[in-house]
Amino acid sequence: RGCGTAGCRRTWRGRPTAVGRVALHWAAGAGHEQAVRLLLEHEAAVDEEDAFGMNALLLSAWFGHLRILQILVNSGAKIHCKSKDGLTLLHCAAQKGHVPVLAFIMEDLEDVALDHVDKLGRTAFHRAAEHGQLDALDFLVGSGCDHSVKDKEGNTALHLAAGRGHMAVLQRLVDIGLDLEEQNAEGLTALHAAAGGTHPHCVRLLLRAGSTVNALTQKNLSCLHYAALSGSEDVSRVLIHAGGCTNVADHGASPLHLAVMHNFPALVQLLINSDSDLNAMDNRQQTPLHLAAEHAWQDIAEMLLIAGVDLNLRDKQGKTALAVAARSNHVSLVDMIIKADRFYKWEKDHLSCRDLSDPSGKSLSFKQDHRQETQQLRSVLWRLASRHLQPREWKKLAYSWDFTEAHVYAIEQQWTGTRSYQEHGHRMLLIWLHGVSTAGENPSKALFEGLVTIGRRDLAELAVASVGAYI
């Protein structure tokens, strides 16, 4: 029923939703031709925008409803409209891959700018590449669009396709001849973008096409850095196989630093196996082990310790990794580092217990011992520390077993109350047990000799009697 009053027109317009959508928007977006015609007959505002600046014409292009688009154009809709993000009809159709709509826009509408940019500085060509719309991209190329244009961040279509992992589009762009080494405003190449986006297939494609594997950004970050930041083992493996450098020379964070910092254990192991510099220092003079100690990453710390990291290196504050762990009260890590330090000092003076002929090397661990075969002895050591050793005696015993001042100081940083010395002594004894077990020594004999050395023969005889069954 026709009505020309303002109130009736408001009824046909419909009440706007929270995002400013009215009836014509919904009808155009859904492709309801009859509803669109009816609304237009009742004087619905053809160019009315929603909260995002999208009108019925833009929505029909976005959803690919060519017939609706034609109806709206014939009803006087403004064809040079754009959303608040700067999206034109061409942007909308290209991003969603609607080639028939693109063809109508280019062939039937007047004065359409093929390379018009949105608020990000991106053309329809950028949008098609970024969203993996190969057919739309081919249409735009055939229409003569600018291939090399950059957005406001300096990205080419190659950057955008690589970063999103669109293989088919990426291959087409490579075939077209886009510059593989073109850098964006931060110095990233398309290979950086593919690596950071964790797209190993795109990384392989670009490397085969001739991308430089060790290209650096303005912050001296390689593609392997970006793979490490995202924790991608697959991308890292591809880059390393292609000659990607695992180290840096300017005291920046290495890929290993980044993998440790973000707690990617499997990637850390891959980088260790790929001859990464375990002792590389970042701009705080921290090694990867310093970072593991700071964040209490036990699994990663063990990998680094087993790999043979230098435990004597100090950061800008003059702290070793042991001191960092102690300061942060990461008790388990403190004990692991002390075990490793004592092990490597023992190893230096003896045949390597990690020799291929020696199976003990295959199970080397510095973590807390939970083995069934040592349970009885560990119980004896706990009773010794908690019931029999006097407050200062654990330290005398530690020094007799070649614990260093740094070791003892690190253990003492833990505070559990006035009887903290009991826990300190227990931890020291467990660290000692790790050493004698690794060395293949008789723990009963070594414990007896140690207690006698500090003047506690009575306790030595008691302890040996307690562990007799274990021996």
Curated annotation (Swiss-Prot):
Residues 379-467 form the Death domain. ANK repeats lie at residues 19-48, 52-81, 85-114, 120-149, 153-182, 186-215, 219-248, 251-280, 284-313, 317-346. Pfam families: Ank_2 (PF12796), Ank_4 (PF13637). Gene3D superfamilies: Ankyrin repeat-containing domain (1.25.40.20), Death Domain, Fas (1.10.533.10). GO terms for biological process: signal transduction. It comes from the Eukaryota. Keywords: ANK repeat, Repeat. InterPro entries: Ankyrin-DD_containing_protein, Ankyrin_rpt, Ankyrin_rpt-contain_sf, DEATH-like_dom_sf, Death_dom. The keyword Repeat applies. PANTHER family: ANKYRIN REPEAT AND DEATH DOMAIN-CONTAINING PROTEIN, ANKYRIN REPEAT AND DEATH DOMAIN-CONTAINING PROTEIN 1A. This is Ankyrin repeat and death domain-containing protein 1A. The gene is ANKDD1A.
